[in-house]
Amino acid sequence: MPQLEFTWWIINFFIVWTADFTLLIVLSIPNLSTPTTLSKQLDINKSHVTWQWS
């Protein structure tokens, strides 16, 4: 059955290329696994204020 073999070849071709592109995207974003950049952006300046009641 050459049609079935060709169909499986097409399916495997797209599976391999999808996996390759997914791996490429994951490896091209090195800061994805480190949340330190996000926490640095969300850092709030905390200062101590002395209230004077008059």
Curated annotation (Swiss-Prot):
A Gene Ontology term for the protein's cellular component: proton-transporting ATP synthase complex
Cited InterPro entries: ATP8_metazoa
One Gene Ontology term of the molecular function aspect: proton transmembrane transporter activity
Topology in the lipid bilayer: Single-pass membrane protein
This protein's record includes keyword Ion transport: yes
GO BP field: proton motive force-driven ATP synthesis
Record field: transmembrane: 9-29
Record's subcellular location: Mitochondrion membrane
Keywords, comma-separated and alphabetical: ATP synthesis, CF(0), Hydrogen ion transport, Ion transport, Membrane, Mitochondrion, Transmembrane, Transmembrane helix, Transport
N-terminal signal peptide: none
Entry-linked Pfam families: ATP-synt_8
Principal location: mitochondrion
Main function: Mitochondrial membrane ATP synthase (F(1)F(0) ATP synthase or Complex V) produces ATP from ADP in the presence of a proton gradient across the membrane which is generated by electron transport complexes of the respiratory chain. F-type ATPases consist of two structural domains, F(1) - containing the extramembraneous catalytic core and F(0) - containing the membrane proton channel, linked together by a central stalk and a peripheral stalk. During catalysis, ATP synthesis in the catalytic domain of F(1) is coupled via a rotary mechanism of the central stalk subunits to proton translocation.
Subunit and interaction comment: F-type ATPases have 2 components, CF(1) - the catalytic core - and CF(0) - the membrane proton channel.
Family recorded in the similarity comment: Belongs to the ATPase protein 8 family.
Name under which the protein is recorded: ATP synthase protein 8
Organism: Arbacia lixula (Black urchin)
Gene: MT-ATP8
